[in-house]
C-alpha cells in the first residue's frame, strides 16, 4: 500500500486506493452537479475514470508531499515530468492492443483543462475530507492543511465545488447517526 500524508501524524492511515476511489466518487458528483444544477454537459463518468487514475503514477514515484511538490514552479514542472515518465512506464505494462484506452487516464498532461479542473477540485475535496476526519478524531495536526485546502478550493472558483461544499460537506462533519439528517436538509 502507498500511504498518503506521510509527513503528518494520522489517526487513520489513508492509502492510494482509498483516496483514488473517494476522488472518483467526488469527481463524478461534481460532473453530475455541473450537468443537473448548472446545465453543463461534462461527462461525469469520464471524470470518475480520470480521478480513479489521477495518482496512479504514485505506484512508481510514491506520494510526494504537497508542500514539497508545489514549493516552486521549477519543482512542480520537474515533478510533472517525473509523473509523465511514470505514466508512460505504467503504459508499457499494459498489452499494446489496450494501451490507447489507458493513455489519457494515465497521462494527466493529455487531459483537457475542464476535466483537469474537476478532477483537481475532487482531489482537493478528498484531502479536505481527510482533514475533517482527522479533526473529528481530535488530531489538530491537520488544522493548517485544512485551512490551506479550503483557501485553495475558494481560489479555484468552481461553482460545482462550492455546491458540493454547501450540500455534502456538512454530512461529513456529523456523527454517523446524524449524517442522514445533514444530507436530507441540504436539498
PLM-predicted stretches and their roles:
Residues 1-187:
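Alpha-helical, largely C-terminal catalytic domains
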Amino acid at each position: 500500500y502507498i500511504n498518503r500524508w506521510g509527513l503528518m501524524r494520522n489517526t487513520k492511515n489513508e492509502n492510494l486506493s482509498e483516496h483514488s476511489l473517494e476522488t472518483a466518487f467526488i469527481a463524478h458528483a461534481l460532473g453530475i452537479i455541473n450537468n443537473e444544477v448548472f446545465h453543463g454537459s461534462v461527462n461525469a463518468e469520464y471524470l470518475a475514470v480520470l480521478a480513479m487514475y489521477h495518482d496512479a503514477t504514485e505506484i512508481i514515484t510514491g506520494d510526494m508531499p504537497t508542500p514539497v511538490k508545489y514549493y516552486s514552479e521549477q519543482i512542480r514542472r520537474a515533478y510533472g515530468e517525473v509523473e509523465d515518465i511514470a505514466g508512460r512506464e505504467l503504459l508499457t505494462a499494459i498489452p499494446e492492443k489496450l494501451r490507447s484506452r489507458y493513455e489519457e487516464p494515465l497521462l494527466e498532461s493529455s487531459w483537457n483543462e475542464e476535466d483537469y479542473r474537476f478532477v483537481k477540485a475532487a482531489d482537493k475535496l478528498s484531502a479536505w475530507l481527510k482533514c475533517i476526519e482527522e479533526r473529528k478524531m481530535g488530531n489538530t495536526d491537520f488544522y493548517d492543511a485544512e485551512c490551506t485546502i479550503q483557501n485553495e478550493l475558494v481560489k479555484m472558483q468552481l461553482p460545482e465545488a462550492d455546491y458540493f461544499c454547501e450540500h455534502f460537506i456538512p454530512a461529513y462533519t456529523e456523527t454517523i447517526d446524524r449524517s442522514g439528517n445533514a444530507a436530507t436538509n441540504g436539498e
